Amino acid sequence: MYTRYSYNPTLGRTYVYDNKYYKNLGHVIKNAKRKKNAAEHELEERNLDPLDKYLVAEDPFLGPGKNQKLTLFKEIRNVKPDTMKLIVNWSGKEFLRETWTRFMEDSFPIVNDQEIMDVFLVVNMRPTKPNRCSVLAQHALRCDSDYVPHEVIRIVKPSYVGSNNEYRISLGKRYNGCPVMNLHSEYTNSFEDFINRVIWENFYKPLVYIGTDSAEEEEILLEVSLVFKIKEFAPDAPLYTGPAY
């Protein structure tokens, strides 16, 4: 007969589990997913291995080629708070005529072994009272030929211009370089056809607005320029043939 003070071998019996045979279920699932993701990532990298022999520039503006800068205008614009002002509108053909004439006649000689790889619209904005506000910018590339943009718009999701106060837009259409061969004859024969078949076939029409985050009216010094990225091919024969080669 057992009493409460009697020894009972079943009382106080404990079971000890060896942890090496038991694992957390969440850990098992996470580890399986981790192995699966690692295998997929390794397969993806293996498919991209042939691309290792190619070099690309992180910033196309700093990539290979010659940058030819053409300053369009410099002026001061007053910008009111909570608004953005139109500073670039390429709907006028006279503006385009002057720009391309200067580019082709004054900038550098056009030869047959050059090609326009890209065109950048660069807007340098410097407030006359620095360290008081940040500059905002907004742009659009595609618009109908009969679209008339507003001179002033409200600020809607603009981009903050960096500390260098430079806003840069690529105007070249992707995968569509603009060869410079016979451009002089195209331009001289018919300017209207040149605009439609050469310029708008290869480049976008930009609309650019600027503003500030200031609560007061600000004066901004603008410098708007085009930077042509020129691809130069190697000549057929070396420029110098002699014992040094």
From Swiss-Prot:
This is Polyhedrin. It comes from the Viruses. The keyword Hydrolase does not apply. GO terms for cellular component: viral occlusion body. The keyword Transmembrane does not apply. GO terms for molecular function: structural molecule activity. Major component of the virus occlusion bodies, which are large proteinaceous structures (polyhedra), that protect the virus from the outside environment for extended periods until they are ingested by insect larvae.
